[in-house]
Amino acid sequence: MRKIRPLAFVLATGLGFCGTVSVASADGDAGAYLAARLAGSQADYVLAAQYYARALAADPQNTQLMENAAISEVGRGAVDKAIPLARSFDTKGGRNQIADLLILTELAQKEDFAAAIAALDAGRSAGQLVDGLYRAWALLGLGQMSEATGAFDAVTKISGLKSFGLYHKALALASVGDFEGADAIFAGADGGPLRATRRGVMAHVQILSQLERKADAIALIDESFGPAGDPTMMALRLELEAGATLPFTVVKGARAGLAEVFYTVASALGSENTDLNTLAYARMAEYLAPEEADAILLVANILERQGQHALASAEFDKIARDDPAYLQAELGRAAALVQSGRVDAATEALQRLAKDYPDRIEVWNTLGDTYRREEQFAEAAVAYDKAIGKISGDEAGYWSVWFARGICNERLKQWPQAEADFRKALALRPDQPAVLNYLGYSYLERKERLDEALGMIERAVAARPDDGAFVDSLGWGLYRLGRYAEAVTQMERAVELMPVDPVVNDHLGDVYWAVGRIREAEFQWRRALSFGPEEETEAARIRRKLEVGLDRVLAEEGAAPLAVTKNDR
């Protein structure tokens, strides 16, 4: 699970939430307060909201509790409950960006655009970018289009924000029927074409359709997503091919425009390590546009990254079956179910998807991954067979499917098929370190192609020098080749990188034994046992080495004895 910093601290560095709440501030119910803090530190918004509500009931005038309660309600998606808390916080003299964000969102939801502008004029702020775009859309909501255009232009003049201002100006023009003006912006009349975000492409496609440029719209979809990409875009493409004129639906009015502002900011923050800030803006977007699939999916993905799998699953569930985004949502829901331990439910959902979408490679691939995760390798291999059977044209992007099937075949002891899959994956992606390492290590274990295996692993380690598994493979390869002194250096490095891995510690023990460091070998074998080998056969072999030594174990297994030395090679 991803590590989450304490809730209040995260927000203090982003949206301006207060950094700490003293225990003394929650004297009415210190236990509830402490439980809320713990839940918040784990991003458990539901539990945090429950405990903050209890603490606030015992101390209803406490503004810091109001603030933290509002944070938790936003996190769990109860924006309608967070808004009154923000209002109370504000009335009692509290002031910060989360309260301002919630109050501005409430005004947008009510479409009280005059009050929204007055709030900005009075100093309320949700951040420089939001404030500028919010003002522009509110002016549009008041019917003041020329003033709105000027406000969008003002945003474009702020350093680093030009593309945001242009994008929203284009949406605003399209929302009032000026498709020529909107197309000019997307095409680059104001200094180069806008960066092709998914939402931007969707908007431009709809604009081109309105301008009766269907061929250009189809070409834009193909250029941006390929022949079998995003299901929503493919649905638009089918409509265009059928001769339909697409309505402009990305933004239908000022409130939807304000929702798009919050979605834009959340998406921009998505690549940064500020998930709670991102979630707050995404929740505002969802609140203002509850039917917007993109906002729902963004919220769900953020929650998934935070480890809040139940909340994420509930979000994915909001996407209707007839929505083109349903496939993406169900794949996301299945992933959330897996992460929450409900693998059977995830498998069932994926099996249904496979029946409904039998030609979608990603469905079969995800089903295979789910089976493989549970070590159901035969079932996984069948699913990967289906996925590979659907691949046509450029195969390079699907190297991982052959790699995954190769792992299944290797585990099923079907080595010829496994080797062929690994070789195919390497043919598609020659320098892929995971494939190089896995195939190289497999050759080592089979005592085949040892020199080639070592070369593969060396390439993998060169690509990922801090990957303990790869360094372990390199050390083990040197050991297999009898280059024991060199193996010691690599295996010691592997243990530094993976100190509690039983296999790596066991390997280091063998290498120490090979160079005569008997006590250190025994110490490493005991460490390996303490970390719990996955298989009892592995543990039994380690215990036998401790009883009689590695040389005797190799003799009992009919294996070749250790070389005297090959370190001069």
Predicted segments with their positions:
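Residue-level recognition of tetratricopeptide repeat
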Residues: 37, 71, 105, 137, ...
